[in-house]
């Protein structure tokens, strides 16, 4: 580590930052209204020009914040000369804390760096370097949690934090995630981040709580363009309790979902699980005949019914459900032959021949 008397050292830069903050203390803006997600670029922030100032100190004509923004967001080509990973490996814990303090000193500043692909990657590298660094980054994530979770590159920082943070930091992050899970699930970037967290969360209590929130709102999420991916993912986890809860939430709505592309994927997932197959098949058997025929001839519904037949035929414990479904469909055999339901007609004919 360079001596503090060196005007080009990191310590000198951090001391300069402290002097600047004493003269012009930063006052964080108030948090956004609860539930409001604003994805616009923070006012007053734009990436600085890519050309480096020739002065080796790096901040003669820049504030410490500008210097740090440029360091965090520079391109991979610019980083190759002196990689960020190597740079932070030579810093003391005090200097690392100083960097983290600068990066998190203003919520808009932190978010602007996190929205940059390279900035996001370098913030992720800082996570886990020390408990003090983690506390500062965790606090910054929590302060703008919805903004972070519903933006592509910032959400990677939060996901990394959930994997690495321990103790109260992880608990605070989990509690905020559970509190905002449904808003996040309905966002195109948020649903991806939420799925990652559902997979990675290694705290049984919070994981079950999060899955319960998702399962309880499975119906509304299943009809949402982004939320349906969260329900599909929750079912892929093969957690019996969650599968049962999702099935209970969707009971009576499986046929409606089966008419839609992504909804049919969810219903097919339910057919795969012992805990939920009966819920789907009973709804098919008890449905109005005309409605069942329309489903069997529909673009996506025919796959659901064909799968229901295959699944119940193979499972001895479901033989009664299989027989009931075949009897329900057999009167429509003629109508199914020359339609999207021809696969169902072929199956029924093979059963009748046997």
Model feature map: region roles:
Residues 1-354:
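Eukaryotic gene-expression regulator signature that favors modular helical reader/repeat domains
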């Amino acid at each position: 580590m360079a001596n503090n008397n060196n005007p080009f050292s990191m310590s000198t830069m951090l001391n300069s930052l402290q002097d600047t903050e004493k003269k012009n203390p930063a006052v964080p803006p108030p948090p956004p209204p609860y539930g409001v997600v604003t994805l616009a670029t923070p006012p007053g922030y734009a990436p600085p020009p890519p050309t480096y100032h020739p002065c080796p100190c790096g901040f003669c004509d820049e504030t410490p914040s500008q210097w740090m923004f440029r360091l965090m967001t520079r391109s991979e080509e610019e980083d190759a000369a002196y990689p960020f990973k190597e740079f932070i490996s030579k810093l003391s814990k005090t200097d690392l804390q100083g960097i983290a303090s600068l990066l998190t000193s203003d919520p808009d500043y932190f978010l602007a760096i996190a929205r940059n692909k390279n900035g996001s990657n370098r913030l992720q590298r800082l996570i886990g370097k020390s408990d003090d660094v983690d506390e500062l980054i965790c606090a910054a994530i929590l302060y703008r949690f919805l903004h972070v979770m519903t933006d592509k590159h910032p959400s990677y920082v939060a996901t990394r934090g959930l994997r690495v943070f321990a103790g109260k930091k992880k608990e605070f992050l989990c509690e905020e995630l559970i509190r905002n899970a449904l808003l996040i699930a309905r966002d195109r970037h948020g649903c991806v981040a939420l799925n990652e967290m559902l997979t990675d969360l290694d705290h049984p209590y919070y994981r079950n709580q999060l899955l319960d929130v998702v399962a309880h709102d499975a119906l509304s999420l299943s009809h949402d363009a982004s939320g349906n991916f969260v329900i599909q993912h929750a079912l892929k986890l093969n957690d019996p309790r969650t599968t049962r809860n999702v099935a209970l939430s969707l009971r009576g709505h499986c046929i409606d979902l089966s008419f839609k592309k992504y909804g049919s994927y969810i219903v097919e997932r339910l057919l795969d699980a012992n805990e939920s197959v009966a819920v789907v098949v009973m709804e098919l058997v008890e449905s109005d005949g005309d409605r069942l025929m329309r489903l069997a001839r529909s673009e996506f519904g025919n796959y659901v019914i064909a799968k229901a037949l295959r699944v119940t035929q193979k499972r001895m414990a479901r033989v009664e459900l299989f027989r009931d479904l075949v009897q329900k469909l057999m009167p429509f055999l003629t109508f199914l032959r020359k339609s999207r339901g021809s696969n169902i007609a072929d199956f029924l004919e093979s059963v009748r021949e046997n």
